[in-house]
Amino acid sequence: MSIQDLRDVKIITAMITPFKEDGSINFEVLPELIEHLLSHHTEGILLAGTTAESPTLTHEEELELFGAVQKIVNGRVPLIAGIGTNDTRDSIEFAKEVAAFGGFAAGLAIVPYYNKPSQEGMYQHFKAIADASDLPIIIYNIPGRVVVEMTPETMLRLAEHPNIIGVKECTSLANMAYLIEHKPEDFLIYTGEDGDAFHAMNLGADGVISVASHTNGDEMYEMFTAIEQQDIRTAAAIQRKFIPKVNALFSYPSPAPVKAVLNYLGFEVGPLRLPLVPCPEEDAKRIIKVVVDGDYEATKATVTGVVRPDY
């Protein structure tokens, strides 16, 4: 696979990792889950990202997961592998390993967390990863989890690297607009914030790397279709109903809410690995009512209780 596989991909699902009660990966659930995603307009899948609980997955588990998903997907949609850590050497070695493994359109590498690197440190980190293998790299800029934020200027420097093909941007819409205006033509820009997908697509973003597409992919697809058809009134009407669902899906540390909904829908994706824990039962019930049923009272509680989702 290559960057060309991602050219017209607008909805990429950052897929959860299903676990058994003993904490091991539940590979038996994967076929049903993946077919559900593909039948509801997922056009690409990110594995071993934040939503997959990658901090608590070993590289060996990730590679086993990659192989299992590749067999199920069988080339129907492009795959992206989470490969980044806050250790440049480890990120380089895993990027090489994933490149040798094959079958991925790109690797997603997060801005280094905890270390708090400078802009030059971020630049050198990603340049080193991109120089080290032929796996195309997408930068993951999410200061809410990382603490530091890559500036648009640093991003545009890295966008000139031939092996850095895009960004999953979770900063401001102002930053996204600036990047879209000034980026190289082939540089892909995805929002990583479901609630901002409407605005990002209207600004000219390439798509979304989504959690909500696990449960509300049809709505997202309909909204994007309306935007493409320049029917902003319809797209905005969908967005108004979509926002409370996104808020609900991020009203407790992710991916606990989306796992609660998927378990309710019968997918048996199981628990989370510590230090993450499931939503409290009453919260889970409210989240399910909002996301699945669009329940008015539960939606009102979500809107008044969450000013902005915590991605």
Curated annotation (Swiss-Prot):
GO terms for biological process: diaminopimelate biosynthetic process; lysine biosynthetic process via diaminopimelate. Transmembrane segments: none annotated. It comes from the Bacteria. Pyruvate binds at residues 51, 209. GO terms for molecular function: 4-hydroxy-tetrahydrodipicolinate synthase activity. Its main location: cytoplasm. Coiled coil: none annotated. The active site is at residues 140, 168. The keyword Magnesium does not apply. Homotetramer; dimer of dimers. This is 4-hydroxy-tetrahydrodipicolinate synthase. It comes from Streptococcus suis (strain 05ZYH33). The lineage of its organism: Bacteria, Bacillati, Bacillota, Bacilli, Lactobacillales. The gene is dapA.
